[in-house]
Amino acid sequence: MAQQQSEIRYLTPPSVDVKKKKYCRFKKSGIKYIDYKDPEFLKKFLNEQGKILPRRITGTSLKFQRRIAQAVKRARHLALLPFVTDMMK
């Protein structure tokens, strides 16, 4: 049997996006401690439902993502941040 090599043809050529490299804002600005008593700062790392945004979206390093998660959990426990909400921002 003859093998046919299938060729994929696109209507528009696939484009390769040059994405800007994400950086950890904590390392860049030299922040060592994430304060759990500052809910306005922590809201930058939460979505509208109050869930913690993942690293792939925020660009933070693993070390600081863990610290953010711990600070958010502490703030929730002290009722500085809600556990769940419909529209937070």
UniProtKB/Swiss-Prot annotation:
A GO term for molecular function: small ribosomal subunit rRNA binding
GO BP term, pick one: translation
Keyword Glycoprotein: no
Keyword Acetylation: no
Annotated InterPro entries: Ribosomal_bS18, Ribosomal_bS18_CS, Ribosomal_bS18_sf
GO cellular component, one term: cytosolic small ribosomal subunit
A matching Pfam family: Ribosomal_S18
SUPFAM superfamilies in the cross-refs: Ribosomal protein S18 (SSF46911)
UniProt keyword terms in alphabetical order: Ribonucleoprotein, Ribosomal protein, RNA-binding, rRNA-binding
Coiled coil: none
Assembly and oligomerization: Part of the 30S ribosomal subunit. Forms a tight heterodimer with protein bS6.
Family: Belongs to the bacterial ribosomal protein bS18 family.
Protein role: Binds as a heterodimer with protein bS6 to the central domain of the 16S rRNA, where it helps stabilize the platform of the 30S subunit.
Name of the protein: Small ribosomal subunit protein bS18
